[in-house]
Amino acid sequence: MPKRTDLKSVLVIGSGPIVIGQAAEFDYSGTQALRVLKEEGLRVILVNSNPATIMTDPEFADATYVEPITPEVVEKIIAKERPDAILPTLGGQTALNTAIALDKNGVLEKYNVELIGANIAAIELGEDREKFKGVVERCGAESARSHIIHTMEEAFAAAEDLGYPMVVRPSFTMGGLGSGLAYNEDDLRRIVGQGLQYSPTTEVLLEESILGWKEYELEMMRDKNDNVVVVCSIENFDPVGVHTGDSITVAPALTLTDREYQKLRDVSIAVIREVGVDTGGCNIQFAIDPATGRVVVIEMNPRVSRSSALASKATGFAIAKIATKLSLGYTLDEIPNDITQKTPASFEPTLDYVVVKVPRFAFEKFPAADNTLTTTMKSVGEAMAMGRNFTEALQKALRSLEQKGSQLDFSSVPEYEVAELIEKAKRPTTDRLHQVQRALLGGATVEDLFEATKIDPWFLDQLQLLNETAQEIRKAGVLTEEMLRNAKRHGFSDEQIGALTHNNEAVVRGVRQALGIRPVYKTVDTCAAEFAAYTPYHYSSYDEEDEVGLHAKPSVIILGSGPNRIGQGIEFDYSCVHASMALRKAGYETVMVNCNPETVSTDYDVSTRLYFEPLTLEDVLEVIAAEERTGGVMGVFVQLGGQTPLKLAQQLADAGVPILGTSPEAIDLAEHRGAFARVLDEAGLTSPKNGTAVSFEDAKKIADEIGYPVLVRPSYVLGGRGMEIVYDEANLSRYIANATEITPDHPVLIDRFLEDAVEIDVDALFDGTDMYLGGIMEHIEEAGIHSGDSACVLPPITLGNNVIERVRTATRAIAEGVGVRGLINIQFALASDVLYVLEANPRASRTVPFVSKATGVQMAKAAALIGTGVTINQLRGAYKMLPETGDGSTLPLDAPVAVKEAVLPFSRFRTPEGKVVDSLLGPEMRSTGEVMGIDKHFDTAFAKSQAAANNALPTEGKIFVSVANRDKRSVIMGVKRLSDLGFEIVSTGGTADVLRRNGIQATPVRKVAEGSSAEGEGTIADLVIAGEIDMVFNTPSGGEARSDGYELRAAATSIGIPCITTVAEFNAAVQAIEALRTYEWSVTSLQEHAANLSAAMEAANA
């Protein structure tokens, strides 16, 4: 049955900012969906607040709204655009919850809009835990014994029936937010309290513990004619109790008997029918008791999920694309499989390889957080690898994480450590895989470890096999052909083999290649080689037959950014995808190398060829060799994927690989303190006084010379890893003592810290002769807060023309002095009217997508072409990629104002005592994602950015103010304006006195440190938790008040009210609150903004 003809326009709801539990996979699904809708001739409207996504590029939709995803805002878009239908299944939990709210508020009925891809009844059945329990029973399957509760009293009553431990799961939340395991009454009180708060329906499910059972997922699709396919089975390496997003997962499931698999399949098909998902995909999670074989259905997601992205990349079956076609009325047998072009989508994929996904964590960013893994997801990214067997895929996946200590360690284990390792492995943490493998290496048995961890014995045997292989490599001592072939089949890297045989990596590689032991590249074809594959999507294996086809033109290789992490996220993937698009359009063959299953760059049709490989020197050199053998390589781009490929630049150049764009020498010059200082001197530019220390004595001397406070950090880092502002010698000695390795190769850099400076960020293009300045961003928070966590505004709102001219001149001088070809990002600070250069990065930065969206100029595409020799003049002329005149520093006065705001994951991380980690910002980056607010003026744009970052500003109510002495004078005007608007101001001791002296009514309240009064009057933290305060404004002072402030900020984070910690942000918030009270909120698409901007620029040039 062909597609429906009654739909003319569709509104797609995106997933908003990247947060833990809802990441780049929804940009990948959303981008596919938009493509399908456009191909089918529909008018496409999109709402998504995240500017770092490919889907918000204006060419993917007819009207792109970068606006907060709230029911109120989406209603305004519906009223303006009048779509026929809404597709809410591709934007994660955010989109589903918004669609449900629009249905409940009567908005869908009012504007006669239909939901496609899922109906409300199916969403409710799948997401509402009580209803879903009924579904499972009607299908003749079991779910865990459970109680649904809405209050604390009900929770304690349920505990008597279920007994401890029990699982707590709130309804309608995502990534396990608010869930946990309660081992006793205190846990129950804490976790249920959070859960009731995070659940939009204040409903929580308590269920019997099935800890230690085996966990599986099936990824399904169903069409309206009741055709059902199982796309992929996924098995969790970790047993139940660890969120599937934090577990190592394997596809296809490896430890199920055929009979068990058929049972799961039958139950899944019954459930998907009963729930009524009839135009799309869903995933269903199961648990199996290893002792009795009892099967329990855990939950279902009636939408495209994180697992669907993994299943798509693992099988080559484009779930999101097919789900979108189903929502338009097609059936599975009418949709062709892109890869084979012969089979329809109703053919279930078969795999002749193993896929392993490994999570990447960021606990080093939150030293106070507890690294136990629970049902609340905590990982920030993931890497995926494919191999012909489990050991090969596992070792490749671990190598793809790029974390110190992520690969297995085969050095000998003393006997006395074994018992301790087994004991530690009982508690699931980020190190559990290594503890298990080391315990086995030290002589523990598979039975011992199964007893301790409940990890399936088959997986434990595989780890044992790796240990045995490592022992054989060590025993051999010499690099023989047989030993190397065997080691490679189990995924050992040259580096690991070198460590076991006391050779360095280069020697192993030389011998291996001389013996002709090279990987071959296999193709992901969805059908175990039954049909030919038309899309070259490859993975390496030490097998027999190579499947890389010949290519007529030399290829351009783009190195991706690897797994998402804090400091290197989707923004870098955006630049890689743009480069590939621009180069393909210009007629080049592009090759993408990456190992992140969530991203658009690893979609099989973004580049001419895709290699799903780790980004290590060994793996990248082998891909280059394969491309050389089959048609030659023009060069490699390392400047687009962040720090990951940049680190390989010099080694690749040493191996004779041509680097496109900025040279490795120029990259090194910008990172090297001394050489960069010479560039600044020659240009007459200043940087804050600084020095390089290799010991505490050095550091003390430098700090005394330049004066405290100082900013200390290791060299070569991204995301401010390990940075700190140090105010005195005692803290300096503590920092140096904790810094892992300080050597002459890895010195510590010490800079004068500029207090009260305005930070400025610039992205520019340089081709050797001309410069194009993409945009000048003014940071809202003061210098000292990491640029990735700071809100910023473009065009700048307080910088005069003279400052902008100085920034321009400095940018050009640095780009020329460093020798950039392509993108460069420079951070400046303006203090007492002196312009300081903080740092320069000769690569795509994390602000490139924001600048591109705010100004309508696609910077990464331009940079890729400059790398192949195109000039800025040509880009302004024949290529029409840059404006003919002017640039991002000369935007007219009526250009729209865009505000970028960071989104922080504090509510996910708790200390071992169960408290939220501190939300105070500093020089180390902690945000996982970003949003953009764009409007005619700064105040409304800032208000939009806060609403989009889930921090909507209040327009009435109570505001708590408590600031450090140094800030008291600067906040009086702002507080007075709020008081005049009718807000009640609540304050502690000192601040309250100052406000009263200035004629501002302030209600005094007790500090956290004072505790409750004898009359039972609570502290400010108690008031916040009781929901009596609508916004907290607290700037930290040194010492004791820091802990006072921490309790308060933790309370605000845990109940989700805005918590402002800098004066600059407070002043911006006051402007925004005034605007919210006076102006009607209007929605404008990026396409409309672009038209307004070009009209304004033409008028300015006329």
Swiss-Prot record:
Binding-site list for Mn(2+) 1: Q285, E299
Annotated positions binding ATP 1: R129, R169, G175, G176, E208, I210, E215, G241, V242, H243, Q285, E299
Sequence positions that bind Mn(2+) 4: E839, N841
Region (Oligomerization domain): 403-546
Protein's pathway: Amino-acid biosynthesis; L-arginine biosynthesis; carbamoyl phosphate from bicarbonate: step 1/1; Pyrimidine metabolism; UMP biosynthesis via de novo pathway; (S)-dihydroorotate from bicarbonate: step 1/3
Cofactor(s) it depends on: Mg(2+); Mn(2+)
Residue sites binding ATP 2 per the record: R713, R752, L754, E759, G784, I785, H786, S787, Q827, E839
Region annotation (Allosteric domain) ranges: 951-1102
This enzyme's EC code(s): 6.3.4.16, 6.3.5.5
Domain ATP-grasp: 133-328, 677-868
Protein name, per record: Carbamoyl phosphate synthase large chain
